[in-house]
Each structure stands twice: as C-alpha cells, then as structure tokens.
Design a protein with these regions (language model features):
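Aromatic (phenylalanine/tyrosine) cluster motif
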Residues: 7, 22, 28-30
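Short glycine-/aliphatic-rich beta-strand segments at the starts of folded cytosolic domains
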Residues: 32-43, 67-72, 110-120, 151-154, ...
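Short, surface-exposed ligand-recognition loops at beta-strand->loop->(often short) alpha-helix junctions
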Residues: 39-47, 78, 116-126, 159-160, ...
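Short amphipathic alpha-helices in soluble, non-transmembrane regions
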Residues: 51-55, 83-93, 129-133, 164-173, ...
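Glycine/proline-enriched, intrinsically flexible loops and inter-domain linkers
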Residues: 62, 121-123, 143-145, 151, ...
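Interaction-mediating elements
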Residues: 62-67, 115, 131, 136-157, ...
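Short, solvent-exposed interaction modules
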Residues: 95-148
Length: 1010
C-alpha cells in the first residue's frame, strides 16, 4: 500500500502515513486473510455540530460533515458469513439512533472522504472492546494475527483545496499515533474506503548484547543523550538521560565484575536512576546549607516535625514510602491520595498522555499497601491560551509543528474524562490555568483518592512485604513497544529527538477488570503479599522495587505476554505499556489466584520468583541478560552537589491610574480564562458515580466553579473527603518563597471554607520546574521548597505524597528557523485533602437569601504582584502579598467553628482576581445581587483586586450577626447586604453597578462554545 506525506486529491487515493514523517522505523500495515468493514452512523449525530464549528473556525470551508464509525474485522483462521457479519453489526450499533452496513460504503453528499485510524501498535480501546463483544456473542476467541480495528470516517462536503484538506487532516489526526487515508468522491465510488488492518510486524527479536563503555567522554555523553547504538539498524535507541558521572559509575561497576554490561542492564539502570524515578535534584545536596537535599530538608523534615508534635493526634498512616500517601478517615478506614504529572507525553499526544496519566495514578491507588479502591479523581491543566496559535516547530524549516494550545487543551480534557468515566470513578475536583509559557510543554496533573479498610483478617492493609520464594506475577495488559523510554524521556526537555515510542494510550476497561478483582476479592482472600503498579520503567522498576522487600528477584523475561512477537529483551523489560500490576503471590496460593483471575477475565502470568540473593537476575530464553546487585541498582548512582545563584527579585509596586468606574473591568476580569467558568469540563466528567457526591465542581443555581469539593466515600458514614488546591505560577518569578506560602494557604482555605478543621488537613506537593540545570532556577526551587517547609510547619499540615518534574522546557525553532526555548513558569501545585467530620454541616459558596449580610474575613493589603489584575492590564512585577500564618490559623479555627455552629450561610476563599472576583462569583452562584460599600483608606482597584491570602467572602443571616461578629471580632469586615438582581459597590460614589445576568454572561462566555 502506498505511503507518502503529500497528496493531490485529483490523482488517486492517498494514505498520509504519518510514520513517514519520522526517521525511526515503524511496523508496517498489511492486509489480513479475511477483512470486513462494518460502518455505523447516527441518524442525527450529536458529535457533529461542535466538530463542524471547530473546523470552520480554522478557516476550513466545510458545507457539511458526516461521521461514520468503522470496525474492521481481520481474521485468518476463519471467515464470518454474511449472516454472522450482520449479527455483529447489530451488536455494534444502537438500532434506535444508528444504522450499519457490512462491506458496503456509507452513502452521503460529500466531496472528500478522510479516514483516521491508529498506527500499528497503538492501543485501540474501541477495537478491543468490539473484539470482546464479538467473542462474547459467538463464544470463540480471536487468535494470533486476528483483531478488530476501529477508525473514523469523515465525509466532508465543501470547496476543499489541498491546503484546506491538509489543515482538516491535521485537525483530525495526531501524526504520532494516527494514519490518515483520503479519497475524493470519485475515488470513493461504489467501493468506498479500503479495509486497512494495521497489525504489527517486526523482524525476529535481537538477542541481548554487550555494550562497551570504554569510550571517550564525548562518546559516553552521546550514549547518555541519544541511547545505545543498535547494531542492526545503525540508529540510536533513544534517550537514557544518563550524565557522565553516572556512566562512569556504571563503567566502573562492570569493570569490577570483569565484564561489559548488557543492553538490558544499561537500559534498566537508566530507568532506575532517571530523574523521573530517583528525583535526583530534590535528593542532591545543594549549596552549603542543604547537605541532605531539598526533599529531606524541607518536605520530609516538615512532615516529621508535624507528626512528632501531634503525637497521638497524628492523622498520617503512610507517607512517602508507597505509591500513595494515606491518612486516617475513621476508626476502620484509611483514605489515600496521590497526584502525578504526565507532561511530556501530553505534549506529543494530549489524549493518550492524559488518559495514561489518570489511569496510571489510579494504579498508584490500587498499588498502595495491599490495594485501595479508587473513589475520586482529580485533574489540573496548565496550557497556553487555547485561542492562540504559536508558530513553534520541533524541526527547522517549519517541520514538525507543535500541537496548538487548543488541541492540547481539548485532548487532555478528553483523556482524563475517558479514564474516569470508563473506570466508574467520579472526577469532581479540578482546575485549569493558562499562560503563554505553557505553549511548548503543558503541565497535566492527574490525581486519585482511594479508600480501604485499615485491617482485614488481622493484617494491617497498608503494610506489604514480598518474601523469598513468592512468585512474581504480572496481571493486566500485555507488553508492547508503547512507552519505551518514558521515564528517561520525561527526565529531559522536549526537543526534536524526543522518542515517538514514549507515547502510550491507556486502557481503562482492562484496568477496571483487574482493579475490581484485586480490591474486592483477591486482597480480602489474602492471595498475595505485595503489589505495585507497572508505571515508569515498566517491569524493570516494579519488580526491582519489590525485590527490595524480599532481597532479590529472578525474572524469566520470555514468559512475559506480548502484544505482538518480535520485541527485544531490553524492550520487554523497560516497556511502559499500560494497565499492568506486579504482585508477590505465595506459591501455595498461586492456583487459587490464577483461577480467580481467569474467572474474572484478567490475564495473569508468572514471570519469576522473589529471592534473597541480593541481586536482580533476568533471563531470556535460557540466557542471563541482567545480573546486578540490588544495592548498586537502587543506590549506586553518584551523589551530586548542586549550586544555586540568587535571582534579583526587587520589583517595586507599579504606579498606574485607577479608573473612575470599574464596571467594564469587572466584566473583563470575569472573562479572563484563569477566572471564568470551565463548566463544560465538569459536565463531561461524571462526578456523581459511586453515589458519594456532596459538593460537586459547580455550585448554586448560577453554577459557578467551586474551590473545593466534598465526597462521601464510606457508605453509611457522615464523614466526607474534601479536596482543594493552590497554584500561583505568576508569583514564582517575583518571590518563589511567598508563592509557596500562597499556594499552601489557598489549598487549606478551600477546605476551611466548607467546614473542614485545620487539624484534619494534609497536603501533597507537585513541583514542575524548568531548566533545572541552571543555578538561577535551582535558587528559585530552593526558595520555594523552603516556603513549603515553613508554610506546612506553621499551619501544622503534613505532606503525605509528592512529585517533581524538573525539565519542563521546549527546545525547537520559530517560523524563521531560529532556535527558541520556551520554559514553563516555575510551577508548584499544592493539593489539600481533609476529612469533614459531618457533611450535613458543610457550607457551599453560593449566596442564598435576601437580606443576608456579606463580609470579608481577613485583612486586605495593597500588594498586586503577580495578580490577575496586573496581568490583565499588561504590567509585570509588583510585590507578592505576604501572609501572617499565626493570625490566619486563629482565623481558620474560628471559621470552622462558626460553620459547625451554623453561623455562616456561604463561604468562599478569595483567590485569583481578588476580593471583587470572589464577591462576584458568590453572587453569580446564588443568582442574587449585592449592595456593598468598600472601606476608605485604600485605592478602590487595589482593595478589590489585591490577592492578599488568608481571606474569605462569607454571607451571614441577620439573626446570626451578633454571634458571628463576636466570634471574629475585628477580623470580619461588613461590606453590605445580599439582595435584588444588581451587583453594586460604592466608595463614596458608585464604582460598579451591574445586573447579575450580565456578570453571569461574562463569566460563562469564554468557553461557551466548547
């Protein structure tokens, strides 16, 4: 079948084989013995309106668009009869709203047909589900070389030039994962599109080989950057992210053994020692005042100090030692939490990267202790403005353009949504942040909360221990080339050499099956002793990490089930193919375990044994391909001593005029993308599944994005899990220390506002830094880490988990082929989790009753540094607002006490955009006006737009005024009353007078068409 990257619609059918855009070889597409196409289309397709409008917005002259779902059934051992194919079509369609055809093209009015499918080896979840549907219906199993492939056919009508066709194809497909087949109407004719079956076909696998390291430093550095030279292809295999000191350590170790390392051993060490896995920057000594590294000095030390001070009141159960952190929920249950990042893969394939991120952190929950049940998902996206189209390219001469911010934004939203919705996990909590420095590499945060009993059958379920003699069992999906070098890839900046194989697509259906059987059955039957997920580094990391529990491992790599034949041993060992867990199963229980997995349709394979030899030994087809001391594997990487260089941060508070009226400014600020409604995300994410919904992502009749959500996770219990977060990237360049304090404070305040006590709150930290090899960036990192330490200790809120991603940079070219580097702003996400003692007393954000009193609780300063207001008027700099934490703590204790007593009708933390935006959101949420007067002594715009931390907007019933004001004293400031349909603020004269409806329109307009 022809393959080319340009096309002329008038000269014949064309496949845009995206694989041809890259120098690395890809498996090829070939025809099966029997191939049949089933085409399914809606009578009225609900997907088309939004897609058509989106394509037209790109300047594509579409008159009409039709969408057809394609299922290509490929078999070799048997063929299906026409009657059977018709039965399959009926199973794959809904007769009420859909029609299907078998081996007959769909008829419609169109000018060009564009079919988009997956490249060989890319996970095809829809195809896999269709295959299983057919197997269940007919009661037989597809064999090797047989499959069902899904694709989508777009029938486009309009005056489409080759340029507009190319633009449409680019909007429909991602060249890293998709193939495109285009035909004109004449070529489509009566036969339609071709039945393409993208099986993977690889050459015979190459045996593990020795790699000589007695090379010059220049040649060693090339191995570290580009990978091992493949003797068969003459190409480098992909980044190892090993520096010279690490390569010297590896060379010296194997010199001591009297042999050269194998490629399996070098690849394994690269995964284990990667920044992604070892967090070397946080672990390394820094300057003279941080000899133990930032992690031990700031994050771990803060948590240890807090836990020691709390004594018997400590809420922590497991911190920093397992896949997630855990706190006490009640006397019988624990809740776990972990937030991961999946930035580099999401830059290449936003949908697959985000989907893999969310199902991966789900596995961190399943892999905590002996298995927690995922009960809440969390998301966060930092991208460029979706309305911009930056001209950035990975190659010169405008080759290999980066994906647009909108493409990334829409892709990551879909990925996390599919992951949660298909897994039956609610996704109530999340946020978005936009900045032009995220155009080169987005930040994609994915988190999961889990719940589990504290003990079962006399065992503490948060404890696990693989023992010598236990069998190593892999469950879930099979291993393929997807995800190879994922850990090392994410340990570097994105550049033109970033590997295609690092892209993965998760399979939530497969994961849901083994998740349920592990958490609901195998765990409580005591069928295994330890469990962890196959994430970064694949088997090389999961097995080797568990081997520390027993003291060694012996792996038979040729037993690992593969997606297709032909993979080399090193590829099998480090592949990050998704939906896999590794378990330690006692030999006497293996029969019961395997029988249970079979009955639940979960593939499970014994791939070796845990030992106490102190070594990680891996065999392939009877040959030892890896034999390394565990001590060297895990702790042999050389220590670093990092140096920082202080950054000048003296930014004066800017001087600029204040408008006489602030009406237009209010509406414009409400429409800023970091402030406005993102309800379209919340409506796509199921946040009520599992039945624990208390406070969801939007609140009030006006449906405003909330700062915190609340979910019941144990049936029958009135306790709930609250989630919130804090993030201030624009503060980082000005004052990273205060930035960290502000993020911690906002994360805590979100929970305080719904009634969760401060002593029931724990934190998670996610550092996403840039250019971490630059001393100036390390100084900012150091200041932020010390802010994390001081803020957590002062508030008494321990860290239970965290993650750092240190190279969030893009290196490429602009439209004129000039080298360009785009680095994200130093970004710290603080996530908060807290236990609400009684969800029936929780308070929502929306103003509720005519005549209620509106207050601001806390003190307002004049600082505007890094604020949304200054960003809106185009001014950088200023002073980041400080926080008196001791005063804030006292205020927060009063807040939760007042909420518990029913003195507060609504509460909302002041955050991005300042007091005015918080007041406006509370009013919009309640669809009720306010008549407010601001105090004198401060310029109106500074008072209303300052983002001073530690504050809340609250409404109080007049009957509770006396008790409320006695509780807070001079810490609460009466602003006015709730009522009417107009939002009015005065300061001796009218500053703002706007209908609530106009404010709601402005707030919801930016993403109204999504």
């Amino acid at each position: 079948m022809p393959s080319r990257t340009s096309f002329d619609p008038g000269t014949g059918p064309c496949i845009i084989s995206i694989a041809a855009l890259f120098t690395r070889s890809h498996p090829y597409i070939y025809m099966a013995s029997h191939a049949h196409r089933i085409e399914v289309h809606y009578s009225c397709d609900p997907r088309l309106q939004m897609r058509t409008e989106r394509f037209r917005s790109l300047g594509i002259p579409l008159r009409e668009l039709h969408l057809v779902d394609i299922y290509t059934i490929a078999t070799s051992k048997r063929d299906f009869s026409p009657e059977e194919l018709s039965q399959i079509g009926a199973q794959l369609s809904n007769p009420v709203v859909q029609r299907y055809s078998v081996d007959r093209p769909t008829e419609a009015d169109f000018d060009h047909a564009i079919e988009v499918g997956f490249l060989p080896g890319v996970t095809d979840n829809v195809g896999a589900t269709a295959r299983q549907t057919i197997e269940d219906y007919f009661g037989f199993q597809f064999g090797e070389g047989e499959a069902v492939f899904s694709s989508q056919l777009y029938l486009a009508a309009g005056d489409l030039t080759p340029e507009s066709l190319e633009k449409l194809a680019g909007a429909l497909a991602n060249p890293l994962i998709n193939r495109i087949h285009i035909k004109s109407r004449e070529e489509y004719g009566k036969k339609g599109m071709d039945a393409v079956t993208p099986f993977v076909h690889l050459d015979d696998p190459q045996a593990a080989g020795a790699v000589g390291l007695d090379l010059s430093d220049a040649d060693l550095a090339r191995i570290g950057k580009e990978g091992i030279l493949d003797p068969r292809t003459g190409e480098r295999r992909g980044p190892l992210a090993l520096d010279l000191a690490q390569l010297h350590a590896i060379r010296d170790y194997f010199r001591g053994l009297g042999r050269m390392p194998t490629d399996v051993e070098i690849e394994s060490l690269a995964q284990t020692w990667s920044e992604h896995c070892k967090h070397t920057i946080f672990a390394s000594a820094m300057d003279d005042d941080v000899p133990r590294g930032l992690y031990k000095t700031c994050i771990q030390a803060a948590t240890n100090a807090i836990r020691k001070k709390r004594g018997d009141a400590d809420i922590c159960v497991s911190v920093f030692t397992d896949n997630s952190g855990a706190i006490i929920f009640d006397d019988e249950h624990l809740v776990t939490c972990k937030v991961e990042t999946h930035n580099s893969p999401s830059a290449l394939d936003p949908f697959g990267g985000a989907l893999t991120g969310i199902v991966g952190v789900n596995r961190d929950t399943i892999g905590f202790g002996l298995g927690a049940k995922p009960c809440i998902n969390i998301y966060g996206y930092c991208t460029g403005d979706p309305d911009t189209e930056p001209a950035l390219f990975r190659g010169k001469n405008r080759e290999n353009p980066i994906l647009s911010p909108r493409r990334i934004f829409e892709g990551v939203i879909s990925g996390v949504g599919i992951g949660g919705n298909c897994s039956g996990i609610p996704t109530p909590q999340g946020w978005c942040y936009f900045h032009d420095r995220y155009v080169g590499k987005p930040l994609v945060f994915a988190g999961t909360v889990g719940v589990m009993p504290r003990a079962h059958n006399g065992r503490l379920l948060h404890e696990k221990q693989a023992l010598p003699g236990d069998l190593i069992v892999m469950v879930g999906g099979r291993v393929g080339k997807d995800g190879i070098h994922g850990a090392t890839f994410s340990s570097e900046a994105l550049d033109p050499a970033s590997p295609v194989t690092a892209v993965q697509i998760g399979d939530p259906i497969t994961q849901k099956k083994f998740s349920d059987v592990i958490v609901r059955e195998a765990r409580d039957l005591d069928l295994y002793r330890s469990i962890t997920d196959n994430g970064a580094g694949g088997l090389s990391c999961s097995v080797a990490e568990m081997a520390k529990e027993s003291g060694g491992c012996h792996v038979l790599l040729d037993r690992v089930p593969l997606k297709y034949p032909g993979m080399a041993p090193w590829e099998i060992w480090i592949s990050e193919s998704q939906e896999r867990m590794t378990l330690a199963v006692p030999e006497e229980k293996i029969e019961a375990f395997m029988d249970l997995m079979k009955r639940r349709d979960v593939e499970a394979t014994v791939i070796g044994t845990f030992t106490d030899t102190g070594r990680c030994v891996v065999e392939y087809d009877g040959t030892t391909v890896m034999d390394i001391d565990l001590d060297f594997l895990h702790d042999g990487l050389p220590e670093k001593h990092l140096r920082t260089l202080p950054v000048e941060t003296a930014y004066p508070e800017p001087d600029f005029p204040c408008p006489d009226r602030l009406d237009d400014l209010l509406l414009a600020m409400l429409a800023r993308k970091n402030i406005c409604s993102k309800e379209f995300i919340s409506t796509r994410y199921d946040h009520t599944v599992q039945g624990g919904h208390v406070f969801g992502p939007v609140q009030g009749s006006g449906r405003v994005q909330t700062a915190a959500t609340l979910t019941k996770v144990v049936p029958g219990s009135m306790k709930g899990v609250g989630l919130s977060q804090g993030i201030f990237p624009t503060y980082s360049e000005i004052d990273p220390y205060r930035m960290a304090i502000a993020a911690i404070d906002l994360a805590i305040r979100g929970l305080i506002a719904i009634g969760i006590p401060l002593d029931a709150v724990a934190l998670l930290d996610n550092f996403c830094w840039c250019s971490s090899d630059e001393p100036e960036r390390l100084w900012q990192l150091k200041r932020a880490a010390f802010g994390c330490r001081d803020g957590a200790v002062a508030f008494g809120t321990p860290y239970i988990s965290g993650k750092d991603s240190m190279y969030n940079d893009f290196s490429g070219f602009d439209a004129d082929s000039r080298p360009v580097k785009v680095s994200v702003p130093p970004t710290l996400l603080i996530t908060s989790i807290g236990i609400h003692p009684d969800v029936t007393t929780a308070v929502s954000m929306d103003a509720k009753f005519e005549g209620d009193l509106a207050y601001v609780v806390g003190e307002t300063g004049e600082e505007l540094g890094g604020s949304e207001y200054l960003a809106h008027i185009g001014i950088e700099g200023g002073v980041v607002p400080p926080l008196d934490i001791e005063a804030a703590k006292m205020r927060y204790e009063k807040m939760t006490g007042a909420i518990a007593k029913g003195l507060i009708a609504s509460a909302f933390p002041v955050a991005h955009g300042g007091l005015l935006i918080a007041l406006a959101k509370v009013a919009i949420a309640g669809k009720i006006g306010m008549d407010l007067a601001m105090p004198g002594g401060m310029r109106p715009d500074r008072y209303l737009f300052s983002e001073s931390p530690g504050r809340f907007v609250v409404t109080v019933a007049p009957s509770d005024r006396e008790a409320f004001e006695m509780t807070f004293g001079d810490g609460a400031h009466l602003l006015g009353r709730v009522g009417g349909a107009t939002f009015r603020i005065s300061a001796g004269k009218t500053l703002i007078e706007q209908p609530i409806r106009a404010m709601e329109t402005a707030y919801k307009a930016p993403f109204g068409g999504y």
